[in-house]
């Protein structure tokens, strides 16, 4: 029950944030950079906790895995609006803007993989979770390889 409340709260909060954020433009490019980096930091934290389970460094706990997958899935749509024209910088490579179609396709692929990961995590099927985690992590890696400064 706590997990359902957390997911409901997180989803409602995200919808409110995305609706407001989509309407508002960032005042300064630095604001967009900070916003997207903050979203990615929270996602990376939750992803890292799941990764520890997949690697056998932490015990499998269905509720914890489901919670972290829900966090990542809820946040996955948010950072992309902060990569608009004039927001170059941070850890993003120029290819984000020069090859924006490829970047957009990579972001959509990641969001689909994260949705699958969330579905698998919520099901409680450990093997399905691990398989989906691997697929989702590959989409993250692919985007990092192509679009994030080393």
Region spans (language model):
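Bacterial N-terminal signal peptides that target proteins for export
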Residues: 1-10
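Inter-heme linker and motif-flanking segments adjacent to c-type heme-binding CXXCH motifs
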Residues: 124, 147-150
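Extracytoplasmic c-type cytochrome modules immediately beyond a signal peptide or single-pass transmembrane anchor
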Residues: 26-133
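N-terminal signal peptide c-region/cleavage motif recognized by signal peptidases
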Residues: 16-21
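The canonical Cys-X-X-Cys-His
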Residues: 136-148
